Amino acid sequence: GLDLFYANWNFYGKMNYKKYQELGENPKFIKSDPEFFRIYVDFKTRKREVKEKSGLKGIDLRKEKFLQSHIGKQQIMNADGVGVTEQKRFQNMINVVKIAPNKDSTQLLNLMNVKYVISMKHIASPDYELVHSYIPIPKDPEERKKFENSTHVKIYENKKVIPRAFLVPNCRVITSDKQYNDVLQSKIFDPTRVVLLDVEPKGFPCGEEKNLEILNPVTIDSYKSNSVELSVDSSKRQLLFMSESFYPGWKVYVNGEEKEILRANYLFRAIVVEPGKHSVRFEYDPFSFKLGLAITILTILLCGIYFIRRSLRRVAPVEKFSLANK
């Protein structure tokens, strides 16, 4: 057991709690944006250790890079990160983003509602604009160019970001992972016009020509870890796409009536909505939690009964003895 005592010796450091919770300059900028969106920290930026000319290092540099251990309480939504358990489909999609030659090579970051990309490397794309860094961005064109090519942690805004939830007029059935991989890696795929589904929805034929309209936004009324409430106003029968993971245990209610959740675009959720105004509520209500709760309560009751009966057995002989002596 002595080896366990020395495990991770000097691995966990200590510092002032208030200083640990202070926001860096980059997180302050992200927090100032009131919209619903996610960030994405470039994989090489997350892993890379650099010597900053500004002298920034340690925890201060980690804050500016939005490393996972520093963004939890800041309520900044990250499209990637380190989790105890991860869905295979999610990991597959993130891997496509990581190996893509450029950030705009696919529609995946747009699809994941990524508005800002954190990167040390310059993103040379008309779809991305350098908007912030913890070091002031030079206004002089030549100095700005040098800054873009530096190793400073920079924030790029994605001009093609797609909303967290929106209405889509058409769908396409995909029957294999290879098909998904081919389509999702293609820049031609437009998630605002067509939703990729595993199966065709009842009463909603995929592939039929439908009148294409401009992107139909959806209002997010409430957003919590275990529930999301939306307001939808659709001019016709469409698919409501939600850039959230498809996962067992999630249920959806349209105007209080439970509906089917479809797996959409390989990883996310979609439902069919009728014309008109609707109140939509996604709710995490897994059977496994209810089963676990029932087992826990039953176990507590059985243990309580056991200990009560055991205590009564110990008291009984004493009572008999006292009565006999009276």
Where are these regions (language model features)?
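Active-site-proximal, structured, solvent-exposed surfaces of multi-pass membrane proteins
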Residues: 187-315, 321-323
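Conserved luminal/periplasmic juxtamembrane motif of membrane-embedded glycan-processing enzymes
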Residues: 1-216, 223-229, 237, 241-245, ...
